[in-house]
């Protein structure tokens, strides 16, 4: 009998943040921390577009942002092979499953822009999975999310939707559906035993009911209180003139977030609960088990002056509790920040253990057993 798995998002940080003090300079220590806190799996960027192009090349990655603590705030050189294989071996040694995704990070040559067709998308994933299969590590893979938050233009600039302005959360168009369906079908032909999906975010979860996602094995959906009701929380905190992923945005959070939250704490918690219940019902109507690896309270946060972690942990705990009660989640994170670079969140071992235990004790959605996910959640 399997139970829901506790998973954490290590995105592209696992390979980019390897300088002294960045959190991932010692994979063994970081993964031991995963086990200590009760997590069963990590979700990482496999960089398939780069591995497919030249596995052993040293790539120069450009920063996607300077303010957040995911990834490198400056350009960084990485060699992905055999690093990915070494990381997977370290995970398997600890019986930690690995979900593969990609944020399609920009390198100096912008290789990702070649992925404009589902055929090129499929090829890069097939090539990456072949490297893993050749190393005898396929039993470590939990599922493959072909693109993070598709078709958001941060992560999928190569894809042109119809109409083109439909980017974030607009996976439901005919163009996006055709792209996803074809790409997954091609990868599945080569590796039929793995679960596949594209991950999404956004409030328009009713499209799970209205669009045919039977070619997915799971719905990976990201949900945060701060982005619900048309990002009401961020509007009340204040909008940074130069964009959300900036130091100005963190200054606004430091100045206003606590007051905005505590002035109507019950409202914000109920907003999250309502969003979770709606998402669970829509995924159930689609016949898909849920995975959420980015969640529940605030989207962007870090160790920073006047940004305490207590309210974030409290809100995330409420999200985990309510999601567990729905019985629709097969894979669940505790926050966006269960990683060693977020010291204020990571060091509270007891908090992680309490929430991962809650996840393990939740009911498993019956849909999980009907797909390949039910097999990959187990260790043989």
What do the predicted segments below correspond to?
Residues 2-6, 41-43, 95-99, 139-145, ...:
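Structural preference for beta-strand elements that scaffold enzyme active sites
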Residues 54-68, 108-130, 156-165, 213-224, ...:
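Aromatic- and acidic-residue-enriched segments that line the glycan-binding/catalytic groove
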Residues 10-24, 62-81, 108-123, 149-150, ...:
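The substrate-binding groove and active-site-proximal loops of carbohydrate-active enzymes
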Residues 23-107, 119, 130, 169-197, ...:
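Aromatic-lined substrate-binding rim segments of carbohydrate-active enzymes
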Residues 99-112, 126-171:
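Active-site groove signature of glycoside hydrolases
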Residues 136, 151-324:
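Extracellular glycoside hydrolase catalytic/binding regions
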Residues 59-66, 302-380:
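Aromatic-rich peripheral "rim/lid" segments of glycoside hydrolase catalytic domains that contact
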Residues 1-26, 34, 45-47:
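Boundary/entry segment of secreted carbohydrate-active catalytic domains
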């Amino acid at each position: 009998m399997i139970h829901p798995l506790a998973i954490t998002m290590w995105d592209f940080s696992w390979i980019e943040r390897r300088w002294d003090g960045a959190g991932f300079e010692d994979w063994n220590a970081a993964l031991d921390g995963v086990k200590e806190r009760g997590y069963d799996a990590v979700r990482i960027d496999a960089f398939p577009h780069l591995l497919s192009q030249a596995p052993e090349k040293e790539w120069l990655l450009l920063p996607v942002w300077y303010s957040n603590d995911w990834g490198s705030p400056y350009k960084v050189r990485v060699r992905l092979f055999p690093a990915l294989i070494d990381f997977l071996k370290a995970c398997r040694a600890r019986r930690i499953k690995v979900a593969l995704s990609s944020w399609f990070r920009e390198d100096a040559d912008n290789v990702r822009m070649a992925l404009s067709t589902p055929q090129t998308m499929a090829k890069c994933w097939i090539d990456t999975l072949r490297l893993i299969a050749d190393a005898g590590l396929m039993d470590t893979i939990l599922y493959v999310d072909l693109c993070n938050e598709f078709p958001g233009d941060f992560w999928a600039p190569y894809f042109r939707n119809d109409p083109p302005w439909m980017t974030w959360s607009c996976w439901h168009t005919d163009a996006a559906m055709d792209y996803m369906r074809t790409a997954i079908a091609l990868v599945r032909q080569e590796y039929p035993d793995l679960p596949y999906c594209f991950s999404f975010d956004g409030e328009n979860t009713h499209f799970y009911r209205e669009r045919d996602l039977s070619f997915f094995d799971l719905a990976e959906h990201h949900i945060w209180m701060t982005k619900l009701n048309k990002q009401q929380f961020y509007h009340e905190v204040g909008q940074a003139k130069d964009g959300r992923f900036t130091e100005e945005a963190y200054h606004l959070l430091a100045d206003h977030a606590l007051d905005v939250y505590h002035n109507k704490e019950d409202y914000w918690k109920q907003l999250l609960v309502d969003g979770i219940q709606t998402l669970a019902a829509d995924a159930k109507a689609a016949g898909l088990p849920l995975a959420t690896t980015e969640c529940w309270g605030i989207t962007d946060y870090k160790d920073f002056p006047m940004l305490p972690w207590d309210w974030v942990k409290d809100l995330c705990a409420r999200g985990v509790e309510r999601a567990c009660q729905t019985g629709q989640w097969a894979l669940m994170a505790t926050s966006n920040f269960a990683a060693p670079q977020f010291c204020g969140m990571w060091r509270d071992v007891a908090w992680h253990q309490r929430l991962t235990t809650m996840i393990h004790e939740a009911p498993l959605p019956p849909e999980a057993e009907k797909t390949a996910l039910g097999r990959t959640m187990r260790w043989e």
